Amino acid sequence: GRGDVYKRQIRVRAVPGSGKTFALTKRIVYLILELYVEPSSIVAMTFTNKAANEMKYRLKKMIGDFATCYAGTFHGYCNLILKEEIYRLSYPKTFVILDKKAQVDLIREVADELGFSLKDFTAKEYADKICEEKQDRAYIPLMLDTGREALQKKISHTQDPFYQVYYSYLKKQRDNYVLDFEDIIQFAIYILTQYKEALKKWQSRCQYLLCDEYQDVNKNQEYLLYL
């Protein structure tokens, strides 16, 4: 029947501005009003806060108080996961998320403590390189209690100025329970892959998963979608 179409995986391919986001919004409305899907079991991922706010506005306009599904960014959803699950890594749920400026400031602070003097441009370059390093989740164990000794060894043994700053930056993050933008998705994936009960809980909550602008997802965002 018609409802079966809404239960299958569907990819909509069309040129920009042709109404893909509107089609996704209408799909959510149909799931809730016609198939009686619990709104809280629907997750709609977008790439920007602007797109998320637009979707929320449309949903509110179409279905009013039924618009209680999650419609937001990947980072926003992963932040929800971390608020509930980060205790598993011995981090408090009051952890702090750095914006780009605060991250650059922390990098400069770490460099100063190491005796380096980083200019603004160099500190921003280091921030970009740290972002690249964090595309692989192998760094996360270094930011846990069990990785303190291994991290200290890396700080002591590396001669490369960037890696001295990088590993000291990880230590500073861990000591102060601070995450940067890259950590949000990576920590969420790490928890969901290391703790099966956490994965099952979030899978059971998310019965319908929708993603706007799927062609723009990176490998980590795609990995999250398929968990």
How would you name each of these model-derived features?
Residues 1:
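Glycine-rich phosphate-binding loop
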Residues 4, 8-16, 23, 43, ...:
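Conserved helicase NTPase motor core
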Residues 4-93, 97, 200:
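P-loop NTPase Walker
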Residues 33, 83, 112, 174, ...:
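Residues at helix-coil transition
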Residues 66-69, 87-183, 206:
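ATP-hydrolysis module of ASCE/P-loop NTPase motor domains
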